[in-house]
A protein has these predicted regions:
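RNA-interacting cores
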Residues: 1-226
């Protein structure tokens, strides 16, 4: 079977109820595919069993750019609602530090202090028109479809039911919109010192490749929020 080639693609996520959880509103396609790669090739890492010798090169089916970046965009969508919801995080009463917070008179362990204290956490829930998130990429269509089939949701707190995907559509297009789009503007964080022009976007430390939470991947970037 001949190898598939990298082509410009439009990727559409159809959400079940149109809601997903994200603080800054940025959802990156390469981050989704990165997570899917580990589901397929290294599930033990997601289970907390990290063995460096079992992790080789993480090869996503995307064009590989300089600085180990991938040719993939953020999601674009029409936001129609935005609310703050809260979730409660239970304390771990069996944590080693809990005896330090035992009230000897009452015989009660405080759940509001300590490393594993209880939390009431806010999260920003966004609702998008028609439940559609659109991404752009340059990569191998069949391989991307294969990885996306493993991803049931996008954004944070999918276990709570946010960002659940009903289906993924991947289609070939003519142009590469992974960096800029004529309608939507900048399509991913771009390093300030490597940008070929000035952008009217906030400048902040932001990751340029997945995993986006990892400090080592952060650079001073133009970030297309809002």
């Amino acid at each position: 079977m001949p190898k598939s080639k990298c082509v410009p693609l439009k990727v559409t996520a159809h959400l079940v109820d149109g809601r997903f959880s994200s603080t800054d509103g940025i959802v990156m396609l390469d981050s989704i595919l990165y997570h899917a790669w580990f589901i397929k090739h290294a599930p033990h890492v997601l289970e907390g069993v990290y063995k460096p010798e079992q992790i080789g090169y993480v090869g996503l089916p995307l064009v590989h750019l300089e600085d180990n970046r991938w040719a993939a965009s953020k999601a674009v969508y029409q936001e129609i609602d935005k609310i703050v919801e809260h979730y409660n995080k239970r304390p771990d009463f069996f944590a080693g530090d809990k005896l330090d917070y035992l009230d000897m008179d009452k015989g009660i362990i405080s759940d509001s202090v300590g490393l594993y204290r209880a939390y009431r956490n806010p999260q920003l829930i966004r609702t998008v028109k028609d439940g559609i998130l659109t991404f752009y990429a340059v990569g191998k269509k069949d391989k991307i479809e294969e990885l996306l089939s493993l991803m049931i949701g996008v954004g944070k707190k999918t276990a709570m039911g946010f960002g659940i995907v009903d289906r993924w559509d991947v289609e070939e297009i003519e142009e590469d919109y992974t960096t800029e789009h004529p309608k939507y503007g900048l399509m991913r964080p771009i390093e300030v010192e490597k940008a070929d022009k000035t952008y009217d976007y906030p400048i902040m430390d932001y990751a340029i490749r997945p995993p986006y939470w990892k400090t080592i991947n952060q650079r001073l970037c133009y970030v297309p929020v809002g």
